[in-house]
Amino acid sequence: MSQSVESRTRIKSERYESGVIPYAKMGYWDADYVIKETDILALFRITPQPGVDPIEASAAIAGESSTATWTVVWTDLLTACDLYRAKAYRVDPVPNVADQYFAYIAYDIDLFEEGSIANLTASIIGNVFGFKAVKALRLEDMRMPVAYLKTFQGPATGLIVERERMDKFGRPFLGATVKPKLGLSGKNYGRVVYEGLKGGLDFLKDDENINSQPFMRWRERFLYSMEGVNKASASAGEIKGHYLNVTAATMEDMYERAEFSKEVGSIICMIDLVIGYTAIQSMAIWARKHDMILHLHRAGNSTYSRQKNHGMNFRVICKWMRMAGVDHIHAGTVVGKLEGDPLMIKGFYNTLLESETDINLPQGLFFAQNWASLRKVVPVASGGIHAGQMHQLLDYLGDDVVLQFGGGTIGHPDGIQAGATANKVALESMVMARNEGRNYVAKGPQILRDAAKTCGPLQTALDLWKDISFNYTSTDTADFVETPTANI
């Protein structure tokens, strides 16, 4: 219902009084706000300072992440200020947690430059995270409108094209990370790549911190790695790859390394999250132009995603990276050595793989999201996984994933090739059991033991790592109220 002229006049008079007035009074709180299809929505977990009303704190977050400053400024009247103000429209207490609240905030699409993650983040996670009115602030989820998503390229290659290029269907991809991360010579590095691929893996990869150090310069690594790839591919008659990490100090250096990776025949290159959003988008544009798969290692994400009351949830990174245009991103294993609640991990994977997701509070998805035909990102599971967990990995993560066994390949007592073979046989036996309709989750250990009767490397792996697990309580789980209609 439209406001009367008198009401609008009164609000305008109050809203533009000189001096400092509450953010809620300035128009950054609107409990009756009607969400537009083109609005960008954000959900923040706020911990107000003692004595600060949660509605005022939410309005302050809306204001400081959009158009407000600490005092009323008359130049607001030169803009469409009532449109451009972000609106906090709902505040809910966080279930079972004292003094924390979920604040829902809507932003008009015109506040953001088209196709720019850097501009989006400058507002959403900018100065507002240092705001004194809140003790802690965490960005939990976002909804991107279709009109905004259409301004982004999306994944350079995408899952479907990658499967066609690799000629691998009906199962997860298998990979491994070269270990040790640092210190190998180029020749020894290439040998590790060859042995892993010869044993049956689809991919080997560089780790996040191998760039161009004195013990092995990047060009040497690229040449020896691709020698291993080509030799293993010719031997197996299959397409294989190695993620060549092109991360460097400048964009010029990264472009040079990426161009060289293309010249020596690589089908995939790799970057780290720490290079920044603009660099990631730039490399994604380069990758699509040059028909390359682009792998992203999430190095650095836990510095702001792991703590539950401050920073941002990794699902937001998943959304931004799908928009930015990467083809792979590390997204958790559930059973490995790194942080990962099963339901939350499922939410990450759905965010990367589904064309449309619904609200699912147990998975931490607070908004429905239509992905506007952006291609799918392949999640990567790595960190502390081994062949003995194959039934759990297939159950939790499904087919559309890269299973990366680093130590679980290179740590095999009989050598790298044997470690790769153990993982390949474990995966094939589990996929076969699933396709035959067997209860592969309940009977997984027995299926693996049966397969090991004709595969010595698998038997050795099961004997070595059978008791290895990482059963720690996750620090980041979904907060929701259990009800008979909960979306579980």
Curated annotation (Swiss-Prot):
Binds 1 Mg(2+) ion per subunit. Mg(2+) binds at K205, D207, E208. Its cofactor is Mg(2+). One of its GO terms (biological process) is reductive pentose-phosphate cycle. The active site is at K179, H297. The modification N6-carboxylysine is found at K205. One of its GO terms (molecular function) is ribulose-bisphosphate carboxylase activity. It holds the Pfam family RuBisCO_large. The record marks K337 as: Transition state stabilizer. Its EC number is 4.1.1.39. It catalyses: 2 (2R)-3-phosphoglycerate + 2 H(+) = D-ribulose 1,5-bisphosphate + CO2 + H2O; D-ribulose 1,5-bisphosphate + O2 = 2-phosphoglycolate + (2R)-3-phosphoglycerate + 2 H(+). It is an enzyme of class 4 (lyase). GO terms for cellular component: chloroplast. Keywords: Calvin cycle, Carbon dioxide fixation, Chloroplast, Lyase, Magnesium, Metal-binding, Monooxygenase, Oxidoreductase, Photorespiration, Photosynthesis, Plastid. It is found in: Plastid, Chloroplast. Substrate binds at N127, T177, K181, R298, H330, S382. RuBisCO catalyzes two reactions: the carboxylation of D-ribulose 1,5-bisphosphate, the primary event in carbon dioxide fixation, as well as the oxidative fragmentation of the pentose substrate in the photorespiration process. Both reactions occur simultaneously and in competition at the same active site. The basic functional RuBisCO is composed of a large chain homodimer in a 'head-to-tail' conformation. In form I RuBisCO this homodimer is arranged in a barrel-like tetramer with the small subunits forming a tetrameric 'cap' on each end of the 'barrel'. Heterohexadecamer of 8 large chains and 8 small chains. Belongs to the RuBisCO large chain family. Type I subfamily. This is Ribulose bisphosphate carboxylase large chain. It comes from Pyropia suborbiculata (Red alga).
